[in-house]
């Protein structure tokens, strides 16, 4: 297995065009698990750790551009924790400090797992994913980016360059249920915001991201609406019935927090 280490985004895109089957790797928190458990073995690994354009975040006319290499630790401890509080809460629940220091939001989106912790808080903020290739760039709403369990719209020659959103500055929160308090894959997760409109998105309860909205004056029925929008399954972490019930309970608790 060959490892390529580009130093600019242009070099990375050229490498991806030349090796469309290459696996991008930055934090490696998902890729290394896949390799260690023989879930795949590409001919080429594309190491993106030296590509400065993918790191950090910038402000653009009131909007934010989050580099795909932005880590959970960056979000948890940096300036973004006050700007995107639900995403910061989600970041604090991811794995261990070592995982949060390495794991990236671009990796979370690229893996496209229904349990991805970054997806619900990004979705309630209307995030848009910027995909790049030598052919150009395109922006896809996050709600349309993930198409199923570990499937997305990325073309073989594309990389996730960044995520764009305009902070709502609305009360928001993130909650997660698992078999223990830390270092756990979510049985159910939930992000909720409350402005003139209530917005909710959940994880581990549908094959792809779902955004549920309602007028603020329909708060009393919102938890039931969120649970009805889910499409959970039975698996080793929880049953369909439990997940749907837990989602309704979490939504009720989240609403009390954001509407207080």
Where are these regions (language model features)?
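C-terminal structural segment of proteins
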Residues: 1-260
